[in-house]
Structures are given as C-alpha cells and as structure tokens.
C-alpha cells in the first residue's frame, strides 16, 4: 500500500474508488495499491 498525496491509475486494471471518505486505488497487481493521505 502506497500512501500518496495524489493517487492515479498506473495500469488498465487499476480502479479508483472511495472508501470511508478516502480515495483509493485497487488493482490485481498488489504493487499498484494506493491510498490518499
């Protein structure tokens, strides 16, 4: 899980979602997991 000020999609499979008011990126590749913070 990467914590970044700005999250963006890295590949085609990445999905930007909102969970509990936080913007997150979920993907089939675990390296692409990000959270805004």
Swiss-Prot record:
Listed A to Z, the keywords are: Ribonucleoprotein, Ribosomal protein
GO annotation (BP), single: translation
Can you name this protein?
Answer: Large ribosomal subunit protein bL36
Name the HAMAP family on file: Ribosomal_bL36
Q: Which gene encodes it?
A: rpmJ
Instruction: Kindly list the GO CC terms recorded for this protein.
Output: cytoplasm; ribonucleoprotein complex; ribosome
The UniProt record lists the keyword Metal-binding = no
Q: Please list which residues make up the signal peptide.
A: none
Q: Which domain of life is it from?
A: Bacteria
- What is a single Pfam family found in this protein's UniProt entry? Ribosomal_L36
The similarity annotation says:
Belongs to the bacterial ribosomal protein bL36 family.
GO molecular function terms here? structural constituent of ribosome
Q: Which residues form a coiled coil?
A: none
